[in-house]
């Protein structure tokens, strides 16, 4: 890793991501851990860190809808469904879309769909724009522990050397709502 970047900076985080490592960063409600969705090595590291089975599938968080298009099939959406989704984005609502056949199973798990969100958190927008693609995003916590709400909590759970983007969460109390993009069914209340 290039040590010329300020610790906790976007530049340092992008360098870590490009090296197929996992980072932590603030989101709308809690800190998330994430990695390059196109790197099976990075996703495997994230799953091992979280002790999360690959079968559960993951969420991608992006700066804009264009970043998500290589992973999801939005061809079945009606105009009304599109309006519902885009009225919630950018923001703390995650939608489950049909996945493209080319989307790797390390992202979709046992499903033929993928959960995605366009964030309104300024640091995450900048992170995804600088990295040039979305990130895998899951809450920053070890199994059995509450999600981290500060960078200090991330370091306490994951270790002092863990790469974390310094910043504040968006102040929301609950994680993002999760809905089906086609049916509107709510899987998790936000």
Swiss-Prot record:
The enzyme's first-digit EC class, named in words, is transferase
Q: Which reaction does it catalyse?
A: L-threonine + hydrogencarbonate + ATP = L-threonylcarbamoyladenylate + diphosphate + H2O
Give EC number(s), comma-separated: 2.7.7.87
Q: List the subcellular locations.
A: Cytoplasm
GO BP, one annotated term = regulation of translational fidelity
**Domain of life according to the entry:** Bacteria
For this UniProt entry, what is the primary localization, expressed as one broad class? Answer: cytoplasm
Q: Does the keyword Phosphoprotein apply?
A: no
Q: Which InterPro entries match?
A: DHBP_synth_RibB-like_a/b_dom (IPR017945), Sua5-like_dom (IPR006070), TC-AMP_synthase (IPR023535), TC-AMP_synthase_SUA5 (IPR050156)
Q: Which GO terms describe its cellular component?
A: cytoplasm
* Keyword terms, alphabetized: ATP-binding, Cytoplasm, Nucleotide-binding, Nucleotidyltransferase, Transferase, tRNA processing
What positions does the domain YrdC-like occupy?
7-190
Q: Do you know which Pfam families this protein is assigned to?
A: Sua5_yciO_yrdC
Q: Name one GO molecular function term.
A: ATP binding
Q: Does the keyword Nucleotidyltransferase apply?
A: yes
PANTHER family under this entry? SUA5, THREONYLCARBAMOYL-AMP SYNTHASE
Checking NCBIfam families in the record gives: PRK10634.1
Q: What does this protein do?
A: Required for the formation of a threonylcarbamoyl group on adenosine at position 37 (t(6)A37) in tRNAs that read codons beginning with adenine. Catalyzes the conversion of L-threonine, HCO(3)(-)/CO(2) and ATP to give threonylcarbamoyl-AMP (TC-AMP) as the acyladenylate intermediate, with the release of diphosphate.
Q: Which family does it belong to?
A: Belongs to the SUA5 family. TsaC subfamily.
Record's protein name: Threonylcarbamoyl-AMP synthase
User: What organism is listed for this UniProt entry?
Assistant: Enterobacter sp. (strain 638)
State the gene name recorded for this protein: tsaC
